[in-house]
Each structure stands twice: as C-alpha cells, then as structure tokens.
Amino acid sequence: MSIIDPQLLPRTAVVNDAGVLSIGGVTVAAMAEQFGTPLYVYDEEHLRNQCREAVSAFGKDRVIYATKAFLCGAMARLAHEEGLLLDVATGGELFAALHAGVPGERCVFHGNNKSVEELRTAITARVQHIVVDSFDELDRIETLHAEGLPAPRVQLRITPGVHVDTHDYVATGQDDSKFGFNLNNGDAMRAIQRAQASTAVELVGIHCHIGSNVLSVANFADACAVMVELFLSVDLPELTLGGGLGVAYTNGETAPSMSEWADVLKRATSAIPSEKKVFVEPGRSI
C-alpha cells in the first residue's frame, strides 16, 4: 500500500503492488533515469481535466489561470486551448504567454507596482484588461494615455476586509493588506469614481484576491458576499473573484474540490444579472 495520500498525486498516478509509482503510465524511476533528479513532473491529462472541470462550472473565457503557479510555453498553450484566460503579473510573464502564441486579449495583466514600461507593453498588446492596484498605477496609465496610447480596459482590485485561513504571508484580503483599494476606508469608492470620470481608462469591473492556497470555502463565501453587494451597487459589467483555491501538500491535509469551490461561488453570485460577466481565479488548484 502506498504511504502517499492519493489526493497528493495526479489523477493518472498509480502505485502497484511492489510500491512503484507511475504517472501517466510511466514510472517515476524511468523518468528519473532518463532526466535525472530533482525532477518536476507535470501530467498533461491531469492538467487538462482540472481546466475542463473549472470551465464546465463557469464557462469558456471566464476562468483565469494564475501563471505564477507554473508557466512555460506548453502550460500557457494548454490553458489557452482549454478555454482559460491567463493571469500574468509581470512583463516577463506577459512576454512568455505572447511568445507561446496566446493572444494579448486572452491575458489579464495583474501585479502591484507595475512599471510604466510594463503597462505600456500590456496596453500595446491589448490585453483583456488590466487589474489596477493603486492610485499611483492610475497616474501611470493616465501619463501613457496622454502620450497617445489607447485607454485600456481596467478592473480595480478591491480589498474586501476578509480574513482567510492561509499563511499570513499570502493573505491579501484583510484591511491592512498592501494590495488593492481598501473598501472600508473609502479608497475603493474613490478609485471607482476617479476611474469612471477618467478618459484614460475604460472601467469595466472590480476584482478581489483574498489570498493564496485558501483551504476554506467559507472564506470565499464571505468575500463573495462583500464583493457582490459592491458590484451590484456600482453597476459595472464585470466582476472577478480571486484568491487561489488551495491544494493539499501533506498526508492528512484536506482541500476543497473544484466542484465544492464552484458551488459556493455560483450560489454567492446567483443574484447577479445574467448579462453581467463573472470571472474566477482558481489559482494553483489547476
């Protein structure tokens, strides 16, 4: 019997009676012999199944893959082929996605403290939208627009004031987070009003990211309740619900399934009119 919990392994993983582990029909011993160690193995069938489960729940072009979880040309193409948009958080990640053949309009440009050159590259590439993190970033975009660049589609990152069950270093939704526009101190509404009045941006929505490797679906429900209330009050066409769905790393650790997470988000957004677009970010769970 394997001492490794099956939920820690890809869906195609098999441990035979001799204790030999295979992934996708190939033993890890054979892979180690061919490629050496340490060796990271990604199973394409497992990855595509994860993508398809998320897309089945939310629809094509509504699921955004966090490339910071893992990015190479093959992974970028796989996510794109399966109907996911790509979340890129640096100029380098955007370059890698574009170089892999992913169109700019299927990339969402994330990240805090984006440089002027990164913003210029994203606008020139006509990314799907830019997630604006601060008033300084609005300043930079307005400067680029004054230089003649087109007004990009933007979503504003809102800090909803929600604490999550994850490591403090990767929790990003609480009031003292350094990311986004704080809802409870009024910054969020000030940012929305400024963006709506600006000719330098096309404000299309709001976004939140409550943390990475979140293991409690209740945390997502709490954040959704706050964000949906705000979203309905400002009457914008798009809402993105972020904060990566967690995965188990050790024996005995449990994580919500993709379907459990999807059910919570779908219930929490049920009051949103059908003509509005809801995007989700499943994080490393893909």
Describe the role of every protein-language-model region.
Residues 87-92, 110-114, 151-171, 201-208, ...:
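Non-cysteine beta-strand/loop elements that form the S-adenosyl-L-methionine
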Residues 142-146, 151-152, 167-188:
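Rossmann-like NAD(P)H-binding beta-loop-alpha module
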Residues 50, 159-160, 184-201, 224-236, ...:
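Structured alpha-helical segments in the cores of large, soluble enzyme domains
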Residues 76, 123, 161-180, 204-219, ...:
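Active-site-proximal beta-alpha loop/turn segments in soluble metabolic enzymes
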Residues 212-286:
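C-terminal active-site-proximal or functional interface alpha/beta core segments in diverse enzymes
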Residues 42, 114, 133-136, 176-183, ...:
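Alpha-helix N-cap and loop-to-helix initiation/capping positions
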Residues 1-153, 189, 193, 197-203:
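A charged N-terminal "starter" segment
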